[in-house]
């Protein structure tokens, strides 16, 4: 079997940051998959389930309600390894093009004070597993990287 793109990245050298994971074209429409890497893989502790679940709910809701980006958002969700998220958007983008959006998103999560969107038994298959405080904590740590973003945080090793 052919190895998928994300398995060709040397995770031992991967820093937290924002990376273009892949670009796909379907019927002349480009989709860009963004790797929002919050943790250094296999070095830092992974994001706990309740925190990553909360970031997913708040993040997906905020992105789909962002006036500028709402029509471009296809998907926002966690990586199985729990070191970050994937964001799939319509359009041809580079990592640097997404710094402002991702910074805005995680800043909004840090300051989020409303009930967690979609956190009821009718809306979510695991509604009891949320942790807003840890979601804010993980988001604030990631913002420190975003606020001092360097080339090494924007290009895969």
UniProtKB/Swiss-Prot annotation:
NCBIfam families attached to this UniProt entry: PRK02260.1-4
Binding note for cofactor: Binds 1 Fe cation per subunit.
Top-level taxon: Bacteria
Gene transcribed to yield this protein: luxS
Record-listed Fe cation binding positions: 53, 57, 124
Keywords associated with the record: Autoinducer synthesis, Iron, Lyase, Metal-binding, Quorum sensing
Name of this protein: S-ribosylhomocysteine lyase
Pfam families per the UniProt record, alphabetical: LuxS (PF02664)
PANTHER family in the record: S-RIBOSYLHOMOCYSTEINE LYASE (PTHR35799:SF1)
Chain's role: Involved in the synthesis of autoinducer 2 (AI-2) which is secreted by bacteria and is used to communicate both the cell density and the metabolic potential of the environment. The regulation of gene expression in response to changes in cell density is called quorum sensing. Catalyzes the transformation of S-ribosylhomocysteine (RHC) to homocysteine (HC) and 4,5-dihydroxy-2,3-pentadione (DPD).
Needed cofactors: Fe cation
Subunit relationships: Homodimer.
One of the GO BP terms on file: quorum sensing
Disulfide bond annotation, renumbered to this chain: none
Listed InterPro entries: LuxS_sf, Metalloenz_LuxS/M16, S-ribosylhomocysteinase
UniProt-recorded Gene Ontology molecular function terms: iron ion binding; S-ribosylhomocysteine lyase activity
Family: Belongs to the LuxS family.
Entry EC number(s): 4.4.1.21
Catalytic activity: S-(5-deoxy-D-ribos-5-yl)-L-homocysteine = (S)-4,5-dihydroxypentane-2,3-dione + L-homocysteine
